[in-house]
């Protein structure tokens, strides 16, 4: 997700949600590196915490649920946090789990 966001819709041709749906429809989506960035290139950008970039990551998680993705979703390039690397990993995983729960709740209604 993060690399796609770096290129942005203009650079990649479609947004990340459309890309998820496209690759899933061709059975070519196996592993998702879940991260966010401040903005797409060509402007200077930086990696952000998952909830602090330009992409609505809830939309990405919803797209993964819609295509019934059953592969691996991992946090990727976690920015440093006070408390060390483990704090950033814990934050990222907890945020991702909350997104999964929120999206699953939407689909169960």
State the predicted function of each range:
Residues 1-109:
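Histidine-acidic metal/acid-base catalytic patches
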């Amino acid at each position: 997700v993060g690399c796609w966001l770096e290129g942005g819709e203009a650079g990649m041709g479609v947004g990340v949600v459309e890309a998820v749906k496209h690759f899933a429809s061709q059975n070519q989506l196996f592993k998702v590196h879940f991260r966010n960035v401040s903005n797409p290139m060509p402007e200077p950008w930086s990696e952000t915490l998952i909830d602090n970039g330009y992409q609505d990551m809830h939309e990405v998680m919803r797209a993964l649920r819609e295509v019934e993705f059953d592969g691996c979703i991992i946090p990727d390039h976690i920015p440093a946090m006070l408390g060390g690397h483990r704090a950033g990993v814990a934050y990222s995983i907890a945020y991702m789990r909350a997104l999964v729960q929120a999206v699953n709740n939407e689909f169960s209604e």
